[in-house]
Amino acid sequence: MELKELKKRLVEVFSKYVPQRIKDLEGCVRAAVLVPLFLKEGCLHVLLIKRAEDLLHHPGEIAFPGGIIEPSDQTPQEAALREAFEEVGLDPKRVELLGKLDEVLTTTNFIITPFVGVIPYPYPFKIDGKETKGLLILPLKEFKKEKATPVNFQGRTFLSYKIGEGLVWGATAKNPQRAR
């Protein structure tokens, strides 16, 4: 598959897709993430981060670049791009945003708006070291539903994917499945 073909297919999909929005809920905080997609060796890949262990929220988890929508962010997209720049050095001008996925409510009361974007690869990523401990570059096919296993957390069951030494689960596990 060529990058031009990938973009064309994704633009077509997103032109027909209406993402589900979650209304503002008391006690919830809005956040945004970037689901960065790229072609590597002709196969669609996704970039994930390993969050630092000393963070207040979701320490040590595997996630997409992203974070809380700050008052200075004019839009959720701006927040997702800002956070991706802060965490992995991804220049917002190098991200081609193609669409939005369904919003996700986490068990920690975040309402996450995920944005799908195509990025160049290879890319000189720069891990910030404060919020991000490492990068994971994975083929999107690793997130097939039949590869998922259930994990229980706070009385709820979530899909999860074993990735090397880590586990992708919760809100992060929902988004690659939707992006496929």
Question: Model segments located where?
Answer:
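N-terminal leader/linker segments that precede catalytic domains of diphosphate-processing enzymes
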Residues: 1-63, 68-122, 149, 156, ...
